[in-house]
């Protein structure tokens, strides 16, 4: 029998970390041609024999990568001996996110961020908008004089929401929203960049935020409401103008992505084909990762400590900033058909992330499945410009079709099931 060509059988052990789905730990002989369909049938038959449980959809990992075709092809690609007993891990399949809402705007939606019950969006008509996560429009906010490029929440409770926005008008603006009266005021205008401000991220403690700009600079600012601007004139203080606490130079082109990795470390991505990790205590570069494409967006996961990039091609790439071979791509994710504009790790699911691209599509991925996404999240009619999964219950995205699309994730679907 030629097992490598799919003929004959392979010895496997079936393992799971979800104990209630465990099957007897004995070797099983299965055909080399099996796919996830046949493996699902087999595992569910074993579970029915064990406790009569109903069928569950599983995904299967072979040597830390999702099985996406025939087992024999997967083993051959990984150069795994067909004579050895193969360990196959199975996990309950992550359910498909469900479309919930389409939030209509007057112009391109270039920035979106969810927190609690609220969604904050930024548009090319220079306005910000506040929505409930159920799709009700709450407030339109004017102040910027050019298109919005990025937004982030600073803090949020039942009475007050604070957030920051950045714009092509070269400023960042700090806002305070009174939830009860539904009124908002601009607390500070942050001036210091010499070109449009493309990216923003608030520190974990909410006391600072960082911005990246087309002027190639990374700047760190105070996010505190009562902050006095040291060295500023009385007129600047009274007018609410704020200047940066730290300015860091190192990139050669636009700083298109910025994110706090911890209280004193920042990640940036740039059109100059590099990722940089900055140590704020030293005010310098800690690590630099060279890539071969302009970086449109980057996302760091506090759960797995890995970095994803969205670039000027169709691919997403995974990097490990902790290794000496930081510039070596750990994995490449294939699935989009145009430039990938935006990417974000899940904040609660270690292996999951979402992306949005110029092919009008969002995708939900597992980082162990490089050949294909878990799901396509369809709805946008034009390019996707930003995607957010800050609220574990909702995946939200904005695009050139003037909409924010809201998708319910597993946690929201579970809540819905409990209330029925």
UniProtKB/Swiss-Prot annotation:
SMART domains: WD40 (SM00320). Residues 10-92 are annotated as: Ubiquitin-like (UBL) domain. The lineage of its organism: Eukaryota, Metazoa, Ecdysozoa, Arthropoda, Hexapoda. Belongs to the WD repeat WDR12/YTM1 family. This is Ribosome biogenesis protein WDR12 homolog. InterPro entries: G-protein_beta_WD-40_rep, NLE, WD40/YVTN_repeat-like_dom_sf, WD40_repeat_CS, WD40_repeat_dom_sf, WD40_rpt, WDR12/Ytm1. Pfam families: NLE, WD40. It comes from Drosophila yakuba (Fruit fly). Its main location: nucleus.
């Amino acid at each position: 029998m030629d097992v490598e060509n799919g003929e004959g059988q392979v010895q496997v052990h079936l393992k799971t970390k979800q104990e209630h789905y465990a099957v007897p730990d004995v070797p099983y002989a299965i055909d080399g041609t099996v796919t996830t369909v046949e493996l699902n049938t087999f595992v569910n038959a074993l579970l029915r024999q064990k406790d009569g449980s109903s069928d569950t959809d599983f995904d299967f990992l072979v040597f830390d990568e999702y099985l996406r075709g025939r087992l024999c092809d997967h083993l051959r690609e990984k150069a795994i001996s067909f004579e050895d007993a193969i360990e196959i891990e199975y996990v309950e399949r992550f359910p498909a996110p469900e479309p919930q809402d389409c939030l209509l705007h007057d112009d391109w939606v270039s920035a979106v961020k969810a927190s609690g019950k609220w969604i904050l969006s930024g548009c090319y008509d220079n306005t910000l908008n506040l929505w409930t996560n159920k799709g009700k429009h709450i407030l339109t906010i004017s102040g910027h004089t050019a298109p919005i490029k990025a937004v982030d929440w600073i803090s949020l409770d039942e009475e007050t929401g604070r957030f920051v926005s950045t714009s092509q008008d070269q400023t960042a603006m700090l806002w305070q929203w009174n939830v009860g009266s539904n009124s908002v005021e601009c607390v500070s205008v942050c001036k210091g960049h010499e070109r449009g401000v493309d990216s923003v991220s608030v520190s974990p403690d909410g006391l600072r935020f960082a911005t990246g700009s087309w002027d190639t600079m990374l700047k760190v600012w105070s996010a505190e409401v009562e902050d006095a601007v040291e060295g500023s004139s009385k007129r600047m203080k009274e007018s609410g103008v704020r200047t940066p606490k730290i300015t860091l130079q190192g990139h050669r082109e636009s700083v298109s992505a910025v994110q706090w990795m911890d209280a004193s470390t920042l990640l940036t991505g740039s059109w100059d084909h590099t990722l940089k990790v900055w140590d704020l205590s030293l005010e310098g570069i800690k690590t630099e990762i060279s890539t071969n494409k302009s970086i449109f967006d980057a996302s760091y996961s506090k759960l797995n400590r890995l970095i994803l990039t969205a670039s000027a091609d169709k691919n997403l790439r995974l990097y490990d900033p902790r290794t000496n071979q930081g510039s070596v791509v750990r994995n490449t994710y294939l699935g989009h058909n145009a430039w990938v504009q935006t990417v974000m790790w899940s904040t609660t699911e270690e292996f999951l992330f979402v992306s949005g691209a110029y092919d009008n599509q969002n995708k939900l991925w597992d980082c162990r499945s490089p050949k294909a996404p878990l799901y396509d999240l369809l709805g946008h009619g034009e390019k996707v410009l930003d995607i957010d999964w800050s609220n574990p219950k909702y995946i939200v995205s904005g695009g050139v079709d003037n909409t924010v699309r809201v998708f319910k994730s597993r946690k929201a679907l579970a809540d819905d099931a409990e209330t029925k």
